[in-house]
Swiss-Prot record:
Catalytic reaction equation(s): heme b(in) + ATP + H2O = heme b(out) + ADP + phosphate + H(+); coproporphyrin III(in) + ATP + H2O = coproporphyrin III(out) + ADP + phosphate + H(+); pheophorbide a(in) + ATP + H2O = pheophorbide a(out) + ADP + phosphate + H(+); coproporphyrinogen III(in) + ATP + H2O = coproporphyrinogen III(out) + ADP + phosphate + H(+)
Protein name: ATP-binding cassette sub-family B member 6
Any one Gene Ontology molecular-function term assigned to this protein's record: ABC-type heme transporter activity
Entries under SMART domains matching the protein: AAA
Region span, Required for the lysosomal targeting: 1-205
Subcellular location: Cell membrane; Mitochondrion outer membrane; Endoplasmic reticulum membrane; Golgi apparatus membrane
Subunit structure and binding partners: Homodimer.
Covalent S-S links between cysteines: C8-C26
Its biological purpose: ATP-dependent transporter that catalyzes the transport of a broad-spectrum of porphyrins from the cytoplasm to the extracellular space through the plasma membrane or into the vesicle lumen. May also function as an ATP-dependent importer of porphyrins from the cytoplasm into the mitochondria, in turn may participate in the de novo heme biosynthesis regulation and in the coordination of heme and iron homeostasis during phenylhydrazine stress. May play a key role in the early steps of melanogenesis producing PMEL amyloid fibrils.
Organism name: Rattus norvegicus (Rat)
UniProt topology in membrane: Multi-pass membrane protein
Residues annotated as domain ABC transporter: 590-824
Keyword match Protein biosynthesis: no
Length: 836
């Protein structure tokens, strides 16, 4: 009968890591399985947030193809199953060849942990295959490589099998194959080596994730149809494509074009490294003080050591939650770098938004876009701060602690720190992911509760009309109770997280302290070493206590950053062609030739529109709402590109010249004038930002608003308010006309510039517009036909087509649509609504 003995059996409770010309089997089979188990669980944790894609209705199951990559995936799956079974087979081999010798406890632990770690890898392999198949079923290529966690697990497993080779000359291992037991273990090791090596190589290839491995059948009768190449809208893990996100983020870490800030970044990195050194030196000097006090050292040595310790403590930080001189200096220096980064991101986003088309802006809520900009900017600076100055330093402290305790204490101390901190991080991530849904539900219910209160107060009179105060109070009470129930879950889960963290640190401190006390009692360590270990572990616990918060913030920032980068990836619809030159303006002849155009819905807004505006002429566009009149102006200004046909100015295709040169020759007076929340002078100056005050006043006089401006208490420095709401409709239109006069364009576009004004204001504005349009090519969109009776040509547009054209008298004599519209307006029947 086989029995289990002590953990390390002959090596004692804590033998050395290197003994008899090789690694200690006890140490090796404690470290490696623990590491693999940690990596396996961590890989699973990072996959937990990934949700399964919903396969669209009508999409059938994917079938295996007879392609060359199906067999490699089957081999990969077989190797993963074999790898999971081999540790148990090794344990069975040990039991079968023990011959009455007690098995050390570490073998049992190693077999269980290695099998569980391999099971994690197998499960991840199947899940990633399933995700790839679902992605393919939706016509979206999700990825063509395994996750970082799975690759790391296979890499470390293969590296561990190679690490065994350093013990080739050690009699503790099976290399001599002296008996049946060693021969069995050697054979199993060869099998493990081949298995782990095969998984490592196949993992880099990832045959099970290649699209050629599948055949997609959708609705059988449409098998030859193209795949949907649209972007998937499924919720994705925050940590997916982490490497790509970090590469994008790293571009903002280095302030390009600013040598002084680059030097500041290097200095901050140096200070961060100094902080890591201080975290080691402070416990060391604390240990030295205890040892000096214990050994009754001379006062001079003690005073020098205490002084040095206090100085290092000043540099590091005085107590819990406080920051020291080095950290404060680094924070101070980083302010300029953070401002540089924030400024660069905001300017890049702002420039990109102005490059996007009018179609894009009309389809988006401005508030939503600005939230993406604000959150995206803060996410970049926040991520840099959290990652560079919180997460990375904490992980560095853990690694330094593992190395230090392994080298200067005993390898078992390094293993204890590694297991304790790994378990701490894994449990923190798992519990944080688990409790995220409680926080999300609580926020949703909080919004609903506030909405309930706001809705009730906004309808105050209605509540009074129906004596519904009690009903509203009860509804609000129910909403509060529901919110508080979710709040309790969120708070209780936070308490559970904190208690879990406390237990892990407590067990780690207990294990390390007992081992340290054992070595002190054996005279292998000093009393100060016991103090050093406890101080360093407690010191690590302080930043780790905030790890859950950092994790949540990084999650949120990654999401905001993704939205920002999605915004930056929006394609510019209207672009200058390569090699486009400036518009060479001569006289101002405008031509539309067989122009077709449609918006996103596919319905043609303009159909075969052709007309010519001779230099200095005025052409009016009239017709019912939605006919396409304003669209013609937008196409000429090149807010959109036409579907077919050609638009020319002085014989030059406007799609072949630069947009900025085209728009510099065109002035627009829109129907709904929107002014900036600035002074009247600056709103007029917007027509030409280099204009002086005298030019602004001259433009205002030409627009007939100079006297009205002077009547204001602050004159030209009067603030117009948001969107110009402090001015009347007529005053806003005159400011817009003055702005256009100041621009002095060669072509004028008037988009129902007076339709929203009363009769007296309209006549005054028409007089101002007549001055602006003199000797300039002008296109007018008109609602009131009386304003265009003197136009050189009137185009009647209906359903995107020009159905009549001519001068006012000729169109009336023809008795067509224009004559009917004129008759109705003369009778005072406003049957033609304003154009949209």
């Amino acid at each position: 009968m086989v029995t289990v003995g002590n953990y390390c059996e002959a090596e004692g409770p804590a033998g050395p890591a290197w003994t008899q010309n090789g690694l200690s089997p006890c140490f090796f089979y404690t470290l490696v399985p623990s590491t693999l188990m940690t990596l396996g669980v961590l890989a699973l944790v990072l996959v937990l947030p990934c949700r399964r894609r919903e396969v669209p209705a009508g999409t059938e199951e994917l079938s295996w193809a007879a392609g060359p990559r199906v067999a490699p995936y089957a081999l990969q799956l077989s190797l993963a199953i074999l790898q999971m079974a081999l540790p148990l087979a090794s344990l069975a081999g040990r039991v079968g060849t023990a011959r009455g010798v007690r098995l050390p406890g570490y073998l049992l632990l190693a077999s269980v942990l290695e099998s569980l770690a391999s099971a994690c890898g197998l499960w991840l392999l199947v899940v990633e295959r399933s995700q790839a198949r679902q992605s393919l079923a939706m016509g979206v290529w999700m990825k063509f490589r395994h996750s970082l966690g799975l690759l790391l697990l296979w890499t470390v497993t293969f590296a561990a099998e190679n690490l065994v080779l350093v013990s080739w000359n050690s009699p503790q291992w099976w290399w001599s194959r002296a008996d049946l037991g060693q021969q069995v273990q050697f054979g199993l090791w060869v099998l493990r080596y081949m298995t782990s090596g095969g998984l490592f190589i196949l993992g880099l290839w990832a045959p099970g994730l290649r699209p050629q491995s599948y055949t997609l059948h959708v609705n059988e009768e449409d098998q030859d149809g193209g795949r949907n190449q649209g972007r998937s809208t499924d919720p994705r893990s925050t940590w997916r494509d982490l490497g790509r996100k970090l590469r994008l983020l790293s571009g903002y870490l280095w302030p390009r074009g600013s040598p002084s800030l680059q030097l500041t970044v290097l200095l901050c990195m140096g200070l961060m490294g100094l902080d890591r050194a201080l975290n080691v030196l402070v416990p060391i000097f604390y240990r030295d003080i205890v040892n000096l006090l214990t050994s009754k050292a001379p006062w001079s040595s003690l005073a020098w050591t205490v002084t040095t310790y206090v100085f290092l403590k000043f540099l590091q930080g005085g107590g819990t939650g406080s920051t020291g001189f080095v950290s404060n200096l680094r924070t101070f220096l980083w302010i300029r770098v953070q401002q540089f980064t924030s400024r660069g991101v905001e300017l890049r986003l702002f420039s990109h938004l102005h490059e996007l088309s009018l179609r894009w802006h009309l389809g988006r809520r401005t508030g939503e876009v600005l939230r993406i900009v604000d959150r995206g900017t803060s996410s970049v600076t926040g991520l840099l701060s959290y990652l560079v100055f919180n997460i990375i330093p904490t992980l560095a402290d853990i690694i330094i602690g593992i190395i230090y305790f392994s080298m200067f204490f005993n390898a078992w101390f390094g293993l204890i720190v590694f297991l304790c901190m790994s378990l701490y991080l894994i449990l923190t991530i798992m519990v944080t992911e688990w409790r995220a849904k409680f926080r999300r539900d609580m926020n949703t219910q909080e919004n609903a509760t506030r909405a309930r209160a706001v809705d009730s107060l906004l309808n105050f009179e209605t509540v009074k009309y129906y004596n519904a105060e009690g009903y509203e109070l009860e509804r609000y009470r129910e909403a509060i109770l529901k919110f508080q129930g979710l709040e309790w879950k969120s708070t209780a889960s936070l308490v559970l997280l904190n208690q879990t963290q406390n237990m892990v640190i407590g067990f780690g401190l207990l294990a390390g302290s007992l081992l340290c006390a054992y070595f002190v009692s054996e005279r292998r360590l000093q009393v100060g070493d016991f103090v050093l270990f406890g101080t360093y572990i407690t010191q690590l616990y302080m930043p780790l206590n905030w790890f859950g918060t950092y994790y949540r913030m990084i999650q949120t920032n990654f999401i905001d950053m993704e939205n920002m980068f999605d915004l930056l990836k929006e394609e510019t619809e209207v672009k200058d062609v390569p090699g486009a030159g400036p518009l060479r303006f001569h006289k101002g002849r405008v031509e539309f030739e067989n122009v077709h155009f449609s918006y996103a819905d596919g319905r043609e807004t303009l159909q075969d529109v052709s007309f010519t505006v001779m230099p200095g002429q005025t052409v009016a566009l009239v017709g019912p709402s939605g006919a396409g009149k304003s669209t013609i102006l937008r196409l000429l200004f090149r807010f959109y590109d036409i579907s077919s046909g050609c638009i020319r100015i002085d014989g030059q295709d406007i799609s072949q010249v630069t947009q900025i040169s085209l728009r510099s020759h065109i002035g627009v007076v829109p129907q709904d004038t929107v002014l900036f929340n600035d002074t009247i002078a600056n709103n007029i100056r917007y027509g030409r930002v280099t204009a002086g005050d005298s030019e602004i006043q001259a433009a205002a006089q030409a627009a007939g608003i100079h006297d009205a401006i002077l009547s204001f208490p602050e004159g030209y420095e009067t603030q117009v308010g948001e969107r110009g709401l402090k001015l009347s409709g007529g005053e806003k239109q005159r400011v817009a006309i003055a702005r256009t006069i100041l621009k002095a364009p060669d072509i004028i576009l008037l988009d129902e510039a007076t339709s929203a004004l009363d009769t007296s204001n309209e006549r005054a504005i028409q007089a101002s517009l007549a001055k602006v349009c003199t000797n300039r090519t002008t296109i007018v969109v008109a609602h009131r036909l009386s304003t265009v009776v003197n136009a050189d040509q009137i185009l009647v547009i209906k359903d995107g087509c020009i159905i009549e054209r001519g001068r006012h008298e000729a169109l009336l004599s023809r008795g067509g649509v224009y004559a009917e519209m004129w008759q109705l307006q003369q009778q005072g029947q406003e049957t033609v609504p304003e154009d949209s």
